[in-house]
């Protein structure tokens, strides 16, 4: 049985999945939470860090944690370049909420600073993470970013920022390609999971996505 720990890091969620003494960390949050996450990881034999996409609020601690724990990192194919060059991020806000998120993110000079690291793995649709001790399947969920991915663990789906749950489940408030984001939302609904876990916001039963406005 897979154990799940939700690591709340301000407005960002990281997830620790564990089974039979092996753990995988999903996303790494921002600088101020690195010691909190490191302490949890040290107690849980984390073998891999998976990054759902290449935005700073999800990858700022990847280099630090990878070095401290001596473990590999993985990111979706297509997002690796965001690690090295924030200027290529062609993200657009959706509505007032999206504009507000973008404004406050850019107001923090540290937000776009990411310590460099070279991902050990580039993940794509259908990849399995069994070699790290957990039966997780990778799903490609482009839209928010080109290389956004999710992870399926039995009835649980971890969607990163492919969907958000700030006030209610919705498409991402920021995206590179809205049409792709809509396709990814439809794909998530079609996966048949029971619980959806977001990069931002509380988890919901999958049936709540039936009223998603696309």
Would you name each region that the model predicts?
Residues 41-44, 129-134, 191:
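Glycine-rich phosphate-binding loop signature in dinucleotide/nucleotide-binding domains
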Residues 35-121:
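Active-site HxH/HxHxD metal-binding segment of metal-dependent hydrolases
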Residues 1-44, 150-164:
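Conserved beta-strand hairpin/beta-sheet module of binuclear metal-dependent hydrolase folds
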Residues 17, 27, 37, 53, ...:
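Divalent metal-coordination and catalytic microenvironments
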Residues 135-211:
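Metallo-beta-lactamase
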Residues 12, 32, 56-57, 81, ...:
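Short alpha-helical
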Residues 24-26, 50, 73, 158, ...:
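Residue-level marker for buried hydrophobic side chains located in beta-strands
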Residues 2-6, 26-29, 49-52, 135-141, ...:
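Short, flexible loop segments at the rims of nucleotide/cofactor-binding pockets, characterized by
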């Amino acid at each position: 049985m897979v154990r799940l720990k939700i690591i709340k890091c301000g407005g960002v969620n990281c997830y620790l999945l564990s089974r039979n003494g092996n753990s995988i960390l999903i996303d790494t949050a921002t600088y101020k939470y690195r010691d909190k996450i490191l302490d949890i990881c040290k107690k849980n034999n984390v073998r891999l860090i998976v990054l759902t996409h290449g935005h700073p609020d999800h990858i700022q601690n990847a280099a630090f944690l990878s070095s401290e724990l001596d473990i590999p990192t993985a990111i979706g194919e297509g997002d690796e370049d965001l690690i090295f060059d924030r200027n290529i991020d062609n993200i657009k806000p959706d509505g007032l909420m999206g504009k507000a998120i973008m404004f406050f993110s850019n107001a923090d000079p540290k937000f776009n600073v990411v310590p460099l690291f070279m991902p050990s793995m580039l993940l794509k649709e259908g990849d399995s993470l069994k070699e790290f001790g957990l039966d997780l399947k990778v799903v490609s969920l482009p839209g928010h970013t080109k290389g956004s991915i999710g992870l399926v663990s039995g009835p649980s789906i971890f969607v990163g920022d492919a969907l958000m749950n700030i006030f209610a489940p919705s498409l991402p408030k920021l995206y590179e390609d809205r049409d792709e984001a809509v396709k990814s939302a439809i794909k998530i609904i079609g996966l048949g999971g029971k619980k959806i876990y977001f990069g931002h916001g509380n988890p919901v039963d999958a049936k709540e996505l039936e009223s998603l406005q696309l």
